[in-house]
From Swiss-Prot:
Recorded consequence of changing residue 165 to A: Lack of activity
Family, similarity comment: Belongs to the class I-like SAM-binding methyltransferase superfamily. TRM5/TYW2 family.
Disulfide bond annotation, renumbered to this chain: none
Name of the molecule in the record: tRNA (guanine(37)-N(1))/4-demethylwyosine(37)-methyltransferase Taw22
UniProt effect for mutating residue 260 to N: Lack of tRNA(Phe):m1G methyltransferase activity, but does not affect tRNA(Phe):imG2 methyltransferase activity
Higher taxonomy: Archaea, Methanobacteriati, Methanobacteriota, Thermococci, Thermococcales
Residues the record lists as binding S-adenosyl-L-methionine: 174, 191, 213-214, 243-244
Purpose of the protein: Catalyzes both the N1-methylation of guanosine and the C7-methylation of 4-demethylwyosine (imG-14) at position 37 in tRNA(Phe).
Alphabetic keyword roster: Cytoplasm, Methyltransferase, S-adenosyl-L-methionine, Transferase, tRNA processing
MF terms (GO), sorted A to Z: tRNA (guanine(37)-N1)-methyltransferase activity
Principal subcellular localization: cytoplasm
Subcellular location: Cytoplasm
Length: 333
């Protein structure tokens, strides 16, 4: 085996160089003593051409799970610092690549493929737009498609990212809500999309869930997802195609309402009015406004004549100092 031997004071600079030319061997560990660091490399000829000292040395293998922890292990620092978030939906990787580093997309694609070898499509993330919150995506590597099956919390979720909204980062939140639910509850999920919340809830609990969604493509996929998971579910799901603001007034009240509210939509009054025991209401709030948001929820409870206990938790980052939050509302009377 081969490695490059460098003085400790030069180690950081050389590590970045090895990453940038793509010859750092991530399957083996570097070793160090008081004066030197030896980095594992995959190509000694390139290392020599860079003027580095190549040595024969036995370097330990990393455990499989530690080969690559994240993109920072694989990309030069200047590229990684400018790269946006990376999400995996099924076998599709979605990454934010600013224009200023778009010329490095082959390096970025190579790193993603090493980190996620099962990925078959890599797409560049654009902006959300339109009534259905569809994100603009450009396939930059792999199969020319944006449909896949995503696995989460013991369920399978069909998505077509060119036609529907789906956020894989809510996996933990969907599980949290499912664990709060009790068997026998009647639950309403407006803005249900391809029904990830209803699926996860019904996966774990024997409940009846009503899912309301306006996007006809999402409704079609939701129906396919219901069939796909039929044998996995303890509960039942009823899918309703329509506008939340038109459908909900005609529905009865529910034990619990889970509202993954789209950004810019105010459905607090409506969703609270349909909840008899619990409401989980999502919104996007600046960190300085979180307590004010909680007070707004309490004020709406008072306006509707409900005594409520309200706690607000940060769910995920949206942009600097702005968070997706969830108001967990317990209706006491």
């Amino acid at each position: 085996m081969s490695g490059v031997k460098v003085r400790r004071e030069d180690a950081k600079k050389v590590l970045e160089l090895l990453k940038s030319v793509g010859i750092l061997d991530g399957k083996r560990k570097a070793i160090r003593d008081e004066k030197y660091v030896i980095f594992p490399v995959t190509d000694t000829n390139i290392a020599k051409s860079l003027g580095l000292e190549v040595v024969d040395v036995e370097l330990p293998m990393r455990p499989e799970r530690q080969i690559y922890k994240n993109l920072e292990d694989l990309l030069p620092r200047e590229i990684f610092k400018k790269l946006g978030r990376l999400d995996i939906v099924g076998d599709i990787a979605i990454v934010s690549i600013p224009d200023e580093i778009l010329s490095e997309r082959e390096v970025i694609v190579s790193a993603i493929r090493k980190l996620y070898p099962k990925v078959k499509v890599i797409a560049r993330r654009g902006f959300h737009s339109g009534l259905y919150r569809i994100r603009e995506l450009e396939v930059i590597w792999g199969e020319n498609r944006l449909h896949t099956i995503h696995k989460e919390n013991g369920v399978l979720i069909k998505v077509d990212l060119s036609k529907v909204f789906f956020n894989p980062r809510m996996k933990g939140e969907r599980y949290r809500i499912a664990q709060l639910v009790n068997d026998g509850e009647r639950i309403l999920v407006p803005f249900a999309g391809v029904i990830p919340y209803p699926l996860v809830i019904a996966r774990f609990k024997n409940v009846e869930v009503y899912a309301v969604e306006i996007n006809e493509f999402a409704v079609k996929l939701a129906e396919e997802n219901l069939e796909l998971n039929r044998d996995r579910l303890k509960g039942k799901i009823k899918i309703i195609h329509g506008d939340v603001f038109e459908v909900l007034p005609n529905l009865p009240n529910f034990d619990r309402v889970v509202s993954p509210t789209p950004k810019g939509v105010d459905a607090l009054s409506l969703t609270l009015s349909k909840a008899e025991k619990f409401l989980h209401y999502y919104d996007f709030v600046h960190e300085s406004e979180i307590e004010r948001f909680r007070e707004r929820v309490l004020e709406e409870c008072r306006r509707q004549g409900k005594e409520c206990r309200v706690s607000v938790r940060k769910v995920s980052d949206y942009k600097p100092h702005v968070y997706k939050v969830c108001a967990d509302v317990e209706i006491l009377s």
